[in-house]
Regions:
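Compositionally biased, intrinsically disordered low-complexity regions
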Residues: 20, 33-35, 86
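A short, exposed loop/beta-hairpin motif centered on an aromatic-Gly-Thr core
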Residues: 25-38
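Short aromatic-glycine-(Arg/Gly/Cys) micro-motifs in beta-strand/loop hairpins
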Residues: 7-26
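Short, charged, surface-exposed hinge/linker loops at domain edges
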Residues: 1-8, 37, 41-114
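Intrinsically disordered, low-complexity segments enriched in small/polar residues
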Residues: 16, 29-31, 67, 82
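Short acidic, gly/pro-rich beta-turn/loop elements at beta-sheet edges
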Residues: 21-23, 32, 55
Length: 114
């Protein structure tokens, strides 16, 4: 079975108790760190783990495994988006059994809250 997954995710960067938090709003997953890059790296690891689990479980509508983040975070994202966004790509390794992965990557829109 061939598998292609490509979608745009929404990442919100904000601070909680002095720690930088990266929040994938579509999957309601978070990563944290001392700075933005560490938080994003931790979040990307969580996103990859969810994708690996989904594909190995043959659940190909990955976003149905997760709940979306609460509306207050989407509001923070929309507010932060007014200050500008960055777009990045998160590649997912093609060596995922039991399917042939034709394409698997995410583009994420990154907005930083004030």
């Amino acid at each position: 079975m061939d598998f292609t997954f490509s979608t745009q995710l929404h990442y919100l960067i904000h601070s909680v108790d002095g720690e930088c938090v990266a929040h994938c709003l579509d999957m309601d997953l978070v990563g944290s760190g001392e700075n933005e890059e560490q938080a994003i790296a931790q979040l990307n690891t969580a996103v990859r783990a969810l994708v690996y689990f989904a594909i190995k479980s043959k659940v190909f509508d990955i976003l149905t495994l997760c709940k979306s983040a609460p509306s207050r975070y989407w509001e923070m994202f929309q507010e932060a988006r007014q200050r500008g966004i960055r777009t990045r790509t998160l590649e997912i390794s093609p060596e995922i059994a039991p399917v042939t992965v034709s394409e698997c990557h995410f583009t994420y829109v990154l907005a930083v809250a004030a």
